[in-house]
Amino acid sequence: ARHGGLTEFGEEVVQTMNELGMLVDISHISADAMRDVLRVTKAPVIASHSSAYAIAPHPRNIPDDVLKLVKTNRGVVMVNYYSAYVVPESVASRAEELATEREYRLKYPDPD
């Protein structure tokens, strides 16, 4: 499953992390692997440093369908303020771009 999602062993790791009460961080994995984690996990996940792919199409950012899955999972996505992950074409990060990211992310608020 290299670059294509979780292997069977990867699914077992997620299940073991759930049993141990560990958070599963979906940052730095492919979108397919994110989807697999969200399918397998029994606990909320975290994306400790990720941004919206729709705003800045970087491979480490999270596509909208996964943002929706994280919301359903009651997980947390924390914005990565590295400019290449927030602003298209790696221009220097400015307050307006960060505000755009924040406003976009408000589409996916906590379920409560």
Predicted feature residues:
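Extended, charged catalytic domains and RNA/DNA-binding interfaces, predominantly
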Residues: 1-91, 95-112
